């Protein structure tokens, strides 16, 4: 299933909301209509909490079904909320705090910013229980903003090379294709909310973009 909406006029949904196959994390002030759409499309429990005192869960977190990684600026009461819901969450040690911009992961692997420390990569590997590979894509290190990935497929920045697409496929273990969202926006990871059950994109997303998203994430086979 694919849904389209903007949050208060903002189509860059992947910055605001984090979604995996077992949970979606949203702002506590998110309107009921959005919550209903998220629940229907992604078919996961929803946790309402600020992250680092903000409404930017997607930018400040990354992870997969095994665990979540979070900015070191997280508040203790926010961690308590996540752990009360039995979420395995670990704090990242580095100064690169926009975790969602520098890590993209599914249940098969993780691609990360080459600037991450060895300690950070160890935490990622142990928390997510996957192989961790450093890379840039299309000349950029913000891999979490450049790739939207689930356990079905990965949509990648349109300037990615064939070699980079092959790497995404090898590490994440899913088919990868280039594409855009929101009428030509290349930072697909920052704009898409997705898990294996569905995808949510901004209202500006065009018909051809939706067709590519449907194909890449293999949504025609239905929910898991």
Swiss-Prot record:
InterPro entries: eIF6. GO terms for molecular function: ribosome binding; translation initiation factor activity. Keywords: Initiation factor, Protein biosynthesis. SUPFAM superfamilies: Pentein. GO terms for biological process: cytosolic ribosome assembly. It comes from the Archaea. Pfam families: eIF-6. SMART domains: eIF6. PANTHER family: TRANSLATION INITIATION FACTOR 6. NCBIfam families: eIF-6, PRK04046.2-5. Binds to the 50S ribosomal subunit and prevents its association with the 30S ribosomal subunit to form the 70S initiation complex. Belongs to the eIF-6 family. This is Translation initiation factor 6. It comes from Methanosphaera stadtmanae (strain ATCC 43021 / DSM 3091 / JCM 11832 / MCB-3).
